[in-house]
A protein has these predicted regions:
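An acidic/histidine-cluster motif and surrounding catalytic segment
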Residues: 1-103, 113-150
Length: 150
């Protein structure tokens, strides 16, 4: 877990929690970066051509890539970048802790790394159902899609 400058960031238990709720096919490493809203806005503009901040960005790894220090075949699922300011505001709005919001966002981002896309026309609520099942497994009362009313 790093900040936007690559320095270690503190989000105690987040990686372990995500690993405990992840679907079986989520094999490999997920790099999670906690970044400022301004940094996430820059990334959102650069990679999605949207000049606004967002809560979490997902960057899937190329197939076959391996994370540093991992055995061949273990692989890298990809990177998640979470906007800390947005996460804090959303936590307050949802009446739960910042740590809980980080879990909500990390789970949502992981599903995007696995190829789910709730904005796709052919999704038909599939990502929302998977997110709901996994968040219940992890003890979360609501997921990002459910909160957004999608």
């Amino acid at each position: 877990m790093t900040d936007s400058r690559g320095r270690p960031a503190r989000a105690p238990g987040l990686r372990q929690w995500l690993a405990s709720v992840a679907p079986a096919r989520a094999r490999g490493t997920v790099v999670i970066a906690l970044a400022s809203d301004a940094e996430v806005r820059k990334l959102n503009l650069r990679y999605r051509r949207k000049d606004q901040t967002t809560d979490v960005l997902s960057f899937p790894a190329e197939r076959g890539s391996a994370a540093r220090g991992q055995e061949p075949g273990a692989g890298l699922l990809g990177d998640l970048v979470i906007a800390t300011g947005v996460a804090r505001r959303q936590a307050a709005q949802a009446h739960h802790s910042y740590a809980t919001e980080l879990k909500v966002l990390a789970l949502h981002g992981l599903l995007h790394l696995l190829g789910y896309d709730h904005h796709a026309l052919d999704d038909n609520g599939r990502m929302a159902r998977v997110e709901a099942r996994l968040r219940r497994r992890g003890g979360l009362s609501a997921g990002l899609i459910e909160r957004a009313g999608e």
